Amino acid sequence: RTMAIPALVGTPLPLDESVDGKLGIVDGSDGTIYVDPDEETLAAMQKRRTEEEEKKKLLLTLKGKENITLDGQKILLYANIGNIKDLAAVMQNDAGGIGLFRSEFIYLEQDHYPTEEEQFRIYKQAAETMAGKRVIIRTLDIGADKQCDYFEMEKEENPALGCRAIRICLTRPEIFKTQLRALFRASAYGKIAIMYPMITSVGEVRQIKAIVEEVKASLAEQGIEYGNPEQGIMIETPAAVMMSE
């Protein structure tokens, strides 16, 4: 989807030789594949593709305009990204900012723990590219469906609610501090905000705040420039909902 390539998952396909070399149509909008379509189906699909292209052209005419509802309420329309390559589409489509930068993909795309400098360059590029627009970066959310070999995590019966995201960061503080140092440094170059995932207690928030203060003190002592990014939590667990009440 990110690359604008139609794709299907889990769709049964005829895999015998009878389909070899035949024309196929992949309809990613409703999860259908047509093998050797007749003229009527082919014409209908071509018409739909033309209509989709016209819709995209129409949306591009809205670039630079504010998002306002009929009753005058302004809406902030942000984009989600997984890596720095996605920034081109964000800029092309005139997003108001980045609502979620999934920083775990920086880890998943490498065979080693990303260094502070490696992360700093990526976050800095995102901040500078967005040119004053808000960039909300989620701290490492590894675990569950996002496994990383070099993390050497133990197998769990229920990894979705196990040691993942902020729990890993708090049990492996050096990894967390490295990321926070990179984030605070990059925040001096743009409007970066930091979001902490899978929070379930006030105690975790207090632990995070203590580590953040350590990081800021360390940067100041070393004479390294850093900003003052917004910070918040991702409300995604029942405990977080009840706690926020």
What are the language-model segments listed below?
Residues R1-Q92:
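Acidic, glycine-rich flexible loop/linker segments
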